């Protein structure tokens, strides 16, 4: 088992790149300490298509944010049939989509604060003032 080759994927292109690099470095240190062979991959520097499944046994996903936590890389890893750490494709997508997450919580009777949905392309301060009445939003 200690001969397993672990590819730590870190960095990426999201706004959370720096956090991902820090996470990846900590993971690399811990995985090496356990005696595994570790290599790294940063999708900002190389295309995911360059991942060679013959040279790795498992992928440790240390990416944060878009493409790393939303099911995108998970989908690619499943396509390659490489085991990976992280939630699966659908769970990752649902967790990153806050509206879907809220609907799942409500459907399963999990208390969650009220919310409003704003689309980036039509968000203005004037619309915000018209749509939100802060007193109506309370924690469960």
Model-found features: residue ranges?
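A short, GP-enriched loop/loop-strand-helix hinge that lies immediately N-terminal to
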Residues: 12-16, 55-96, 111-120
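A generic structural motif
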Residues: 32-39
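Eukaryote-biased intrinsically disordered, low-complexity acidic regions enriched in Ser/Thr/Pro
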Residues: 40-53
């Amino acid at each position: 088992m200690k001969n397993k080759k672990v590819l730590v994927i870190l960095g990426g292109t999201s706004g959370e790149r720096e956090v991902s690099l820090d996470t990846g470095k900590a993971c690399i240190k811990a995985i090496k300490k356990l005696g595994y062979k570790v290599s790294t991959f940063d999708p900002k520097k190389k295309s995911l298509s360059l991942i060679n499944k013959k040279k790795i046994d498992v992928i440790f996903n240390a990416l944060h944010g878009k493409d790393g936590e939303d099911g995108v890389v998970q989908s690619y890893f499943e396509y390659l049939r490489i085991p990976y750490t992280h939630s699966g494709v659908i769970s990752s997508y649902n967790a990153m989509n806050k509206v879907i997450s809220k609907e799942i919580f409500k459907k399963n009777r999990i208390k969650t604060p009220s919310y409003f949905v704003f689309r980036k392309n039509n968000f203005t301060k004037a619309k915000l003032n018209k749509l939100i009445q802060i007193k109506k939003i309370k924690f469960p």
